[in-house]
Amino acid sequence: MNDMNLSPVGMEQLSSSSVSNALPVSGSHLGLAASPSHSAIPAPGLPVAIPNLGPSLSSLPSALSLMLPVGIGDRGVMCGLPERNYTLPPPPYPHLESSYFRTILPGILSYLADRPPPQYIHPNSINVDGNTALSITNNPSALDPYQANGNVGLELGIVSIDSRSVNTHGAQSLHPNDGHEVALDTTITMENVSRVTSPISTDGMAEELTMDGVTGEHPQIPNGSRSHEPLSVDSVSNSLTAEAVGHGGVIPIHGNGLELPVVMETDHIANRVNGMSDSTLSDSIHTVAMSTNSVSVALSTSHNLASLESVSLHEVGLSLEPVAVSSITQEVAMGTGHVDVSSDSLSFVPSSLQMEDSNSNKENMATLFTIWCTLCDRAYPSDCPDHGPVTFVPDTPIESRARLSLPKQLVLRQSIVGTDVVGVLPLIGVWTAETIPVRTCFGPLIGQQSHSLEVAEWTDKAVNHVWKIYHTGVLEFCIITTDENECNWMMFVRKARNREEQNLVAYPHDGKIYFCTSQDIPPESELLFYYSRNYAQQIGVPEHPDVHLCNCGKECSSYSEFKAHLTSHIHNHLPSQGHSSSHGPSHSKERKWKCSMCPQAFISPSKLHVHFMGHMGMKPHKCDFCSKAFSDPSNLRTHLKIHTGQKNYRCTLCDKSFTQKAHLESHMVIHTGEKNLKCDYCDKLFMRRQDLKQHVLIHTQERQIKCPKCDKLFLRTNHLKKHLNSHEGKRDYVCEKCTKAYLTKYHLTRHLKTCKEPSSSSSAQEEEDDESEEEDLADSMRTEDCRMGSAVYSTDESLSAHK
């Protein structure tokens, strides 16, 4: 054992190749007791690869491990002798999660003692507070996996870690003894470390300690400084003190010194990030064994260097001189300044200035200081403090592909079609700069191709944003023209509103869209297209732009014809002679599945189950945009259209779009202005079915709030307040066309949609009817529509009870 060839090559590999951002650190010499002699093992020069753990936070080594010329694989440690290989547990390793550290030391000690490897040592079982503690030989259970209550003592200047219980302490051995074995108390002492290199990453570190060229005798590992950081010792001299021999039965090693790594474990209790005080830092420095050589400590620039004072290194077991504290500036780090690095000084270097290799500091520093001041002839991490910021000249903005591809005969201007879908931004159109003759072809149209069926039904935006391409009558794909960077200039050509405006014909050819002029287009004219007859039939639109197409498929050549056609639809959907206040419309299928909590019935048990989930408050279908939940997945799909802007139901008269077909049907009645929905109780007429339902509640629900000035009853107090305004003559919302006044802005807006001609006066009966209608419509404004069915409730409390 004493003749082992321990090459320092492995240590160089650890500090240079397998470790990045190595910082100079110094520690103390580690000695090891003797073991039975055996043949020398050739050193392959491969180090033990200590796991790459988290950064050290102002901590010093709390556990030490031997570096031997062996290798470590993904699942095991390979020693020089195959029979001594042992397997690591499968990842993830516990020390990465809960402050447990996996030390290679027990296996290495067992290797030296020619015994099977022990198990792991829990870090809490090591007493590092400098007080007298029990020896490990009196606590064999500390070698069991992760025994948190174990107590492994560290005596002054000596870390005692036994690979087994020794007979001298009266404890039973953990392993059977062979005939040639000698009872051994394997002990580590620390002395005369000439240099230690630490591959500590500076990511997210508050403070780091890096020690270079530190010597001392019997240093003590500080409390709370366990941090898993792999360190490598380049060379360790063999100068054990005579007092170490025989201490606790320790037998010193004779021969060349061993190469030693230092394993540190992060303390998750003390010295956290941004939580390290100056006293804690001083305590950590106190315990570093240093006497005559300098120590560099890398700190974050946010640390208050002014609060650091001279550090005294007199502790139990230490007799060292105090060291002075100074700050290394950027000039010193760049090589332009000088700092006193005498043997008794301790210098603090900002972590941003600490480099991996001290020989290349100047080269690496240039990457940190990126702003070069030509007047000062130096670099700064930010603006020059003397001359201020530099002047930057930005690049010329590059126009989009759509604008750059515009032919020279055309220009882009505001379109005569109007504004965008939102009704805010003006649309950009394509105008002619010179005469364009008839049968001039433009194209093909370039855009993004999509095979999604959802995009094929995307009709809420301008029609020319989605172009459907068919092959043998089957939709093949869609061309989307919404991104200027992906399309050409043809995306700006707008659709004509009537036949007089049309001067282009859009037609498909070989899976592409082309525009062809249908007439000579003079200068200063906007290009406006409409579809060819065949293409219009494919996509299901009228053959001419001024034709009104009803949802039933009928084409009307004039607005009057279209209005008359809509009226016929309304008469066909008039309620029957039965009470229209019944809960929900009639259905062709029988609703035999009735809810036990409300009067609703359903055509299938699955729909009843979904409805019942609403009563129970179960809403498993959640919106990814606003976290709103629904019990019915169809309601979620309808709700998602609000976020995506998908409105597939468009009014052919005013181009207003809706997310639901029922909303479109209710909107279409506004254009006719006819009140065809009749109340079965009082024969009052309404335009919208929703208004009729709300009105029926007046007849079916009891009104208990009475007006103090008249005998009229109300359902809510806010209705009474509005009614009192009518007694006082307060109608602040006046129609500019007919001078008719209303109590609320909502009712005035509804009136403006149907107001056709001025009216100077109104009869008293009309005023009274308007007041009643306003009251009824006020109820409809606050009505909560249950999405689980067609039920409507007059109060929020009723809706909650329904759900």
From Swiss-Prot:
Zinc finger feature spans (C2H2-type): 593-615, 621-643, 649-671, 677-699, 705-727, 733-755
Compositional bias of kind Acidic residues: 765-778
SUPFAM superfamilies reported for this sequence: beta-beta-alpha zinc fingers
This enzyme's EC code(s): 2.1.1.-
Major localization listed first in the record, in broad terms: nucleus
GO MF terms held by the record: DNA-binding transcription activator activity, RNA polymerase II-specific; histone methyltransferase binding; methyltransferase activity; RNA polymerase II cis-regulatory region sequence-specific DNA binding; zinc ion binding
Compartment(s): Nucleus
GO biological process: methylation; positive regulation of transcription by RNA polymerase II; transcription by RNA polymerase II
Cellular component per GO, a single term: cytoplasm
Name recorded for this polypeptide: PR domain zinc finger protein 4
Superkingdom assignment: Eukaryota
Alphabetical UniProt keywords: DNA-binding, Metal-binding, Methyltransferase, Nucleus, Repeat, S-adenosyl-L-methionine, Transcription, Transcription regulation, Transferase, Zinc, Zinc-finger
SET domain ranges (all copies): 408-532
Family of this protein: Belongs to the class V-like SAM-binding methyltransferase superfamily.
UniProt-annotated stretches for the region Disordered: 757-803
Ranges of compositional bias, category Polar residues: 792-803
Pfam families named in the record: PRDM2_PR (PF21549), zf-C2H2 (PF00096), Zn_ribbon_PRDM4 (PF18445)
Described purpose of this protein according to its UniProt entry: May function as a transcription factor involved in cell differentiation.
